[in-house]
């Protein structure tokens, strides 16, 4: 570094990239590198793969370098494509409709700068994939959405038309014997607050109006679902106590997917009015502040990111209005830690109580977090 006058590791990386690029160019090859190669200065003829969002691709295109857009969201196919995945994924949520909607030419670029975007690429990383069938599951049918997204002029893209044709494409997968994902048929579930803060609402939606929804409640959460003991869904279901609910989407009386289940664990704070004095990180917004009191405890691991709120560079302060004076015997706060993903648990947690919402008294503070086997 001293002999080359390099100030830091970024300039060292740039030196290496430029040197190896000259070698590759001499062999008639082109260097393609992840967007980290922007750090310290870009090699003259390098093509940039923009994976950490779109910022790297935008910067490279403005410098008149060719770019392949491959942002983790929505083009990492090892991310979940269902909110009800039955196996562990690396995290993230990239459903097929999100893939189809992606535009590889960022709006921040001028028409001339946009010409440097060669296209887009989807990636499948195999840390959580143990066999070829699982690879097929991650690829199909999202590959169809990727292909049409890239090959169709922007003005002709039509999700509704694509959706109508998707069942025929799925028949092809079946003819091939491909292990395609049926996540497209999954119900979309959302837990919402009630108007009077009594319990929560469980909202179910299908991808298409042609599909109907049926559901039932499992009195014993250990019992298996019973598709014959069901009710037809016509509006969000009000939940007022702990229990497990099962839902199916149907067409012409036949179930289209595996059942989707939701377990609710109620306490005094469930469904109550909650206010955050600091905003959650845009990378981990969950379903907003209500995520903390919606009665849902994440048992699916990090892939269920909508059940997490993340905070970056600021304390998390939540004010929960219980509505009436309540006797509190204990407070449990669930946190998540995964250092490999740069997610850290809080330094400490402090609980305050108030009778009027103005004067607060510290009730307890701890920095002793007990590891849970749930997540």
Residue ranges and their predicted role:
Residues 38-43, 55-57, 74-79, 126-131, ...:
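Flexible loop/turn segments at secondary-structure boundaries
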Residues 6-14, 46-50, 129-136, 156-159:
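Hydrophobic alpha-helical scaffolding
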Residues 81-82, 86-201, 207-211:
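Substrate-binding clefts and catalytic carboxylate motifs of secreted carbohydrate-active enzymes
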Residues 300-375:
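Aromatic, loop-rich ligand-recognition surfaces of beta-strand-rich domains
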Residues 25-35, 60, 67-71, 153-159, ...:
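Acidic/polar loop patches that form or flank catalytic/metal-binding clefts of enzymes
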Residues 32-69, 74-91:
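Substrate-binding cleft/loops of secretory-pathway carbohydrate-active enzymes
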Residues 164-318, 336:
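Short, compositionally stereotyped local motifs that mark structural "simplifiers"
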Residues 1-44, 51-59:
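Active-site neighborhood of glycoside hydrolase catalytic domains
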């Amino acid at each position: 570094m001293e002999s080359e006058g390099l100030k830091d590791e970024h300039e060292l990386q740039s030196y290496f990239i430029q040197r190896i690029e000259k070698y590759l160019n001499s062999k008639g090859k082109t260097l393609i590198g992840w967007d980290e190669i922007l750090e310290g200065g870009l090699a003259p003829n390098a093509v940039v793969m923009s994976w950490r969002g779109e910022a790297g691709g935008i910067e490279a295109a403005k410098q008149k370098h060719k770019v392949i857009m491959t942002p983790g969201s929505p083009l990492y196919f090892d991310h979940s494509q269902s909110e009800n995945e039955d196996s562990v994924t690396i995290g993230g949520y990239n459903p097929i409709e999100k893939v189809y909607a992606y535009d590889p030419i960022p709006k921040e670029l001028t028409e001339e700068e946009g010409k440097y975007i060669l296209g887009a690429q989807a990636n499948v990383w195999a840390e959580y994939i143990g066999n070829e069938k699982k690879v097929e599951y991650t690829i199909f049918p999202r590959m169809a959405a990727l292909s049409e997204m890239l090959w169709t002029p922007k003005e002709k893209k039509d999700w509704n038309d694509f959706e109508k044709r998707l069942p025929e494409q799925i028949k092809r997968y079946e003819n091939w014997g491909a292990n395609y994902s049926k996540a497209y048929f999954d119900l979309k579930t959302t837990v919402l607050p009630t108007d009077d803060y009594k319990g929560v609402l469980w909202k179910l939606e299908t991808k298409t109006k042609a599909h109907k929804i049926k559901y039932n409640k499992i009195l014993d959460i250990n019992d298996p679902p019973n598709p014959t003991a069901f009710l037809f869904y016509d509006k969000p279901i009000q939940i007022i106590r702990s229990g497990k609910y099962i839902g199916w989407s149907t067409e012409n009386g036949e179930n289209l997917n595996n059942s989707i289940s939701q377990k609710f664990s109620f306490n005094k704070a469930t469904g109550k009015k909650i206010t955050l004095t600091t905003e959650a990180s845009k990378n981990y917004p969950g379903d907003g502040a209500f995520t903390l009191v919606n009665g849902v405890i994440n048992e699916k691991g990090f892939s269920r990111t909508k059940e997490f709120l993340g905070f970056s560079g600021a304390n998390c302060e939540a004010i929960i209005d219980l509505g009436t004076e309540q006797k509190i015997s204990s407070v449990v706060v669930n946190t998540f830690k995964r250092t490999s993903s740069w997610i850290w648990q809080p330094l400490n947690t402090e609980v305050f109580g108030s009778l009027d919402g103005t004067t607060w008294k510290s009730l307890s503070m701890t920095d002793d977090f007990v590891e849970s086997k749930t997540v």
